[in-house]
């Protein structure tokens, strides 16, 4: 859970913010993993609704157009790969909201897209499945 918050809430690329040694081998002297993970989520872009980073955009879209199939993030940015100390394994997430007919409850669905390597941590294979709103 700490890694999720480090990337999605703090939008950080500095391992010192994580307080874990899992990422040490990819960090430089200052603790940075380069333009990877949280760094990419924190880059602000201009939208007609204003400046937002990817996380802010997901939250905006979930609030204003929750049934869209186009609510997603992507941190595998080709032009920045040479400045990442490691390429992202979990590189994209797609979100949508569903509602069962006749029920009030909404369900947030989140799909994690990930590249698999020989040694994948079991907790990474299915990070998020369904949350109730």
Describe the predicted segments one by one.
Residues 1-133:
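Terminal, non-catalytic protein-protein interaction segments that mediate quaternary/complex assembly
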């Amino acid at each position: 859970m700490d890694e999720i918050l480090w990337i999605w809430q703090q939008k950080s690329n500095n391992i010192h913010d994580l307080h874990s040694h899992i990422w040490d081998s990819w960090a430089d002297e200052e603790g940075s993993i380069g333009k990877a993970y949280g760094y990419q989520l924190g880059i602000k872009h201009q939208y007609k609704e204003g400046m937002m980073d990817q996380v802010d955009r997901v939250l905006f879209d979930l609030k204003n157009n929750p049934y869209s199939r186009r609510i997603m993030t992507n941190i595998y940015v080709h032009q920045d790969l040479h400045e990442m100390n490691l390429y992202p394994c979990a590189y994209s997430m797609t979100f949508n909201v569903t509602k069962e007919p006749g029920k009030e409850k909404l369900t947030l669905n989140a799909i994690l897209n990930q590249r698999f390597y020989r040694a994948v941590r079991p907790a990474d294979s299915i990070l998020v499945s369904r949350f109730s709103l």
